[in-house]
UniProtKB/Swiss-Prot annotation:
Keywords: ATP synthesis, Cell membrane, CF(1), Hydrogen ion transport, Ion transport, Membrane, Transport. The keyword Hydrolase does not apply. This is ATP synthase subunit delta. The keyword Membrane applies. Signal peptide: none annotated. The gene is atpH. It comes from the Bacteria.
C-alpha cells in the first residue's frame, strides 16, 4: 500500500539533494493554497479522472504549473498523478513540511497583513514567534487587503490570527447561532 509519507519523504530528499528545500517548501504552500481555491476539489477530481489518459494528465500539469513552479515540484506532481495517488498530495505535502521543520530545526511561517510591515515590526514579530514556537523562524510576508487590519501568521501546523475579517466572521457565526 502506498502512503503519503513515502511521497513526502521523497520530495524532501530530492529537494535537499538539489538544495531547493526553501523554494519547494514555499511552492508547496502556494500549490496547496491554489488547490484549495478550486471548487469542490475539482483539481483533484480532474487529475484523478479515469477519462483522461496519463499523457493528457501530464500535459495538463505542464500547462497549469510548468511556468509557475520549479521543475522538481512539477515532477513531483507528475509522479503522484502517474501513480494514481493525487488524492494523497495534501497529506504528502504536510509530511514534507514536517520533515523540513524537524530536520532543519526551523519553522517556516507566512506573515500576512493588510499593509507592509516595517523592519522593526517584522523583527518583533519574528522574535515573538521564535519564542512561542521555540524554533528558528524563516518567514515570507504577504499583503492581503481583505484583512482590513491586523495580522495572520501561518505555519504548517498552526494558525495565529488577529484581524478584523476574522472577528467579523466570528461575529456573523454568533448571529447565525441565535
Amino acid at each position: 500500500m502506498i502512503n503519503a509519507q513515502a511521497f513526502g519523504m521523497a520530495l524532501f530528499q530530492l529537494s535537499e539533494e538539489e538544495k531547493k528545500v526553501k523554494k519547494v517548501y514555499d511552492q508547496s504552500h502556494d500549490f496547496l493554497k491554489l488547490a484549495r481555491n478550486f471548487k469542490d476539489g475539482s483539481l483533484a477530481a480532474l487529475l484523478n479522472a479515469y477519462t483522461l489518459t496519463k499523457k493528457e494528465k501530464l500535459k495538463l500539469i505542464d500547462k497549469l504549473f510548468k511556468n509557475h513552479f520549479c521543475d522538481l515540484f512539477v515532477d513531483f506532481l507528475k509522479t503522484i498523478v502517474l501513480k494514481g495517488y493525487f488524492n494523497l498530495v495534501e497529506q504528502a505535502l504536510k509530511y514534507f513540511f514536517d520533515c523540513v521543520e524537524n530536520e532543519k530545526h526551523v519553522q517556516f511561517i507566512r506573515i500576512i497583513t493588510a499593509f507592509e510591515l516595517s523592519a522593526p515590526q517584522l523583527k518583533r514579530i519574528v522574535a515573538a514567534m521564535e519564542k512561542k514556537l521555540n524554533s528558528k523562524i524563516v518567514y515570507k510576508t504577504e499583503i492581503d487587503k481583505s484583512l482590513i487590519s491586523g495580522i495572520r501568521i501561518e505555519s504548517s501546523a498552526q494558525l495565529f490570527e488577529k484581524n478584523i475579517r476574522d472577528q467579523l466572521s466570528r461575529l456573523m457565526e454568533q448571529f447565525k447561532g441565535n
